[in-house]
A protein has these predicted regions:
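N-terminal segment of the canonical double-stranded RNA-binding domain
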Residues: 1-14, 18, 22, 26, ...
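N-terminal amphipathic alpha-helical interaction or autoinhibitory segments
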Residues: 33-34
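A short N-terminal helical cap/helix-turn-helix that marks the beginning
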Residues: 37-53
Length: 53
């Protein structure tokens, strides 16, 4: 399964990473890598939760 990850930089310099196909999967980070890692971890939790229910 492939999902799109969108990354933007906020005005305050933080990065935000979002998976549009998974509502609520949105994560901030001080760096792009940090935001991506947090969004990936959250996406995995959301997908695992969906499989359990």
């Amino acid at each position: 399964m492939y999902l799109t990850l969108e990354i933007d930089r906020e005005d305050d310099g933080r990065f935000i990473a979002e998976v549009p196909d998974l509502p609520g999967v949105l994560a901030y980070g001080a760096t792009q890598d940090e935001a991506v890692a947090r969004a990936q971890a959250l996406a995995l939790r959301v997908l695992a939760d969906r499989l359990e229910h």
